[in-house]
Regions:
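A structural boundary/capping signal
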Residues: 1-157
Length: 157
């Protein structure tokens, strides 16, 4: 796998096209909870599938990051997942927070850039950050993720 360095334009093209393919699949009523709910509650699945796509396009290494936002109220707790490539945050589901109140309100559908205050809101435990090597067959949801990935690829061709 080649290391991403100075190819932000290529990375942006891949990522924006991937998000567009998911939106098109959703608009075409592709089956599955992933497409029905996207982007709400799909940041983990999306990050896994996007990581596989980037790996397939020889972009890496990729870090998977999962954090939790803790509000003042005990019930005010939200998880979010994104990827990091060469120090750049890659998030194509941030707009799932567009109806939340500040400080969690966020309406950017595709973000590629440095860490921002929004991402700093999420507490990342040591186990919440790991290298991503693509979809792995031993994962409990592997077949679902793989099926969704194949549908998305259909819209990228």
């Amino acid at each position: 796998m080649r290391f991403f360095r100075g190819r932000k334009v290529e990375l942006e093209t891949l990522v924006f096209n991937f998000r567009k393919a998911i939106e098109t699949a959703k608009d075409n009523d592709e089956p599955g909870e992933f497409f029905r709910k996207f982007p709400v509650g799909q940041c983990g699945n999306t990050s896994d599938i996007l990581a596989q796509y980037l790996i397939d396009n020889e972009i890496g290494p990729i870090t998977y990051v999962n954090g939790t936002y803790y509000g003042d109220d005990l019930e005010d707790r939200w998880a979010h997942t994104w990827l990091v490539v060469n120090g750049l945050v890659i998030d194509i589901t941030g707009d799932q927070f567009k109806y939340h109140k500040r400080p969690l309100a966020y309406d950017i559908p595709v973000y590629i850039g440095p860490m921002t205050e929004f991402y700093r809101l999420f507490e990342v435990s040591p186990g919440g950050r790991c290298e991503h090597y693509g979809l792995e067959k031993q994962w409990i949801h592997y077949h679902e993720l793989k099926d969704w990935y194949e549908v998305i690829l259909k819209y990228l061709r």
